[in-house]
Regions:
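Extended, folded cores of ATP/NTP-driven motor/assembly subunits in large transport
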Residues: 2-6, 11-419
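Glycine-rich phosphate-binding loop of nucleotide-binding enzymes
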Residues: 51-54, 70, 77, 84-91, ...
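Pre-P-loop entry segment of helicase/translocase ATPase cores
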Residues: 406-435, 439
Length: 474
């Protein structure tokens, strides 16, 4: 289990050393409409394109990619350490603002059952089919019902026009695909229609099948995409908001501990609730990082001299300095060494989460569960008071950030917010193979989709190898 410690080689969460934040870097973007007159005006998108590039503000463009989960939780500690270092390398490669999003989206369980269970043929064997279907249904109920997890990374850049932005995204993708391939994760650019569907599925939870907007057709007819993805009602309160089908609350991580387990982010996003969690990251240029670190170091040295002068005036000629100042000096020296020698980078990081429920009582209960998970690791979460709309826009994979609550982290501290957990297999028209031991979701595979569909069935005597082979043969 990888843990971030303040003075260990693996990195540490910087605690209050950068109170004079680089306001320009972490400044939140302004809403397109300060006072929206319609639900459509709450959607922070100016222009869309078929290739998936959205203009979210004047001269600011974003593009979203879906990336697959990999088996991280099942690895040995040494393998996790190696993967962790590769992920750090991936994070260091970013020189633009990005957002990592884990979306616990709605899943049609009836459709899953229909796809996996055997259909009745009334040929005298339906009793056996029913017994088999009962086993599958029992296993489905043990998993995370009604929830399917997807992961996205949204890149945001500033360019003069669409063509320049498109060229820049092409350049970014060259290294992005390579870095994710080294992690074993498949990165897929999301088209404009797919990005709109992700937003539609959030706004119209439970009505996912109603989405039928096409950007190419919309251009011909002059249809506003906002009308097709938004819901009919959106009302914001101090600490929650509601729409036509659900109540939601936006929260954020307010406080981090001195050390943090790499399982924390997984535990937070693995709760069996409909939620969207985003990690907003703003890289700080290396030259600016060293400049501010040196400035801090000189400031601490100056404080030490002043303390000594004050003591000398009081006829106290001890060379001891206060514990707080001594601690600050040691911390800043450790950070400077890591930035110089271990290729650490500095980032502004903010974690925001939107949770959904059918009523306010259920919402409060869910937030208590999240708070319990956070407190168990030494973190604390808080509600985005009077900022529910801004937090919602920040969480969604649009490419805007309207919340300024961020803190500084080094590369390895950021990497501890690990978005990878375990790979799921749920192929369409597949066969039930068992249960994922980590997620408890069923494994449904379709070997016909593989490049080579051959396989072996391993097991001890009596494990059911012959039965499994016969089930595949039908």
């Amino acid at each position: 289990m990888i843990v971030v410690l303040r003075k260990k080689e693996k990195g540490w969460i910087t605690m209050g050393l950068f109170k004079d934040n680089f306001t320009l870097l972490k400044k939140a973007s302004e809403p397109l409409y300060k006072t929206p007159k319609s639900v459509q005006q709450t959607i922070e998108i100016m222009k869309i394109s078929e290739c998936g590039i959205f203009e979210v503000a004047s001269g600011k463009y974003s593009k979203t990619y879906r990336f697959s989960d990999v088996n991280y939780a099942t690895r040995t500690e040494n393998e996790q350490e190696s993967f962790f270092q590769r992920y750090c390398k991936c994070l260091n490669s970013f020189d633009c603002t990005f957002k990592i999003t884990v979306n616990n989206k709605n899943k049609d369980m009836e459709l899953l059952k229909k796809d996996v269970m055997l259909s009745y043929e009334q040929d005298g064997f339906d009793k056996m089919r029913k017994s088999y279907n009962n086993i599958i249904e029992e296993k489905i109920l043990e998993g995370r019902q009604g929830i399917e997890q997807e992961r996205y990374i949204t890149i945001s850049i500033e360019r003069k026009n669409f063509e320049e932005a498109k060229a820049q995204f092409t350049t970014i993708e060259n290294s992005l695909f390579k870095n994710f391939a080294e992690l074993g994760s498949k990165l897929i650019p999301i088209s404009g229609n797919e990005r709109l569907k992700i937003l539609h599925d959030y706004y119209r939870l439970g009505k996912e099948e109603e989405f039928d907007f096409d950007i190419k057709e919309g251009k011909k007819t002059g249809t506003d995409f906002r009308n097709d993805i938004c819901n009919s009602k959106l009302k914001f309160y101090q600490d929650y908001y509601e729409d036509e089908s659900k109540v939601c609350r936006a929260i954020y991580i307010k406080k981090y501990p001195t050390y943090l387990s790499d399982r924390f982010f997984t535990e937070l996003t693995f709760l069996p609730i409909h939620s969207i969690t985003s990690v907003d990251v703003v890289p700080v240029p290396k030259d600016m990082t060293m400049r501010i670190l040196q400035k801090k170091y000189l400031g601490i040295e100056s404080n030490i001299i002043k303390q000594q002068q004050t003591r000398n005036k009081n006829n106290d000629f001890s060379s001891e300095i206060s514990y707080t100042t001594r601690r600050q000096k040691a911390d800043i020296e450790d950070i400077m060494n890591n930035v110089r020698e271990n290729d650490e980078s500095l980032f502004f990081v903010g974690v925001t989460m939107v949770v959904m429920a059918e009523n306010i009582e259920e919402l409060d209960s869910i937030c208590e569960s999240i708070d319990s998970v956070a407190r168990g690791t030494g973190c604390s979460v808080d509600i985005c008071q009077y900022k529910q709309r801004e937090a919602l826009n920040t969480v969604l994979p649009i490419g805007v950030r309207q919340i300024e609550t961020m803190r500084t982290m080094l590369t390895q501290s950021l990497a501890v917010l690990m978005p990878f957990n375990v790979q799921e297999i749920c192929d369409k028209s597949g066969i039930y193979y068992g249960v994922n031991q980590i997620s408890k979701n069923i494994i449904v595979g379709n070997r016909k989709k593989l490049l080579n569909g051959n396989g072996f069935i391993f097991g001890v005597s009596g494990a059911g190898k012959s039965f499994q082979a016969k089930m595949e043969m039908g």
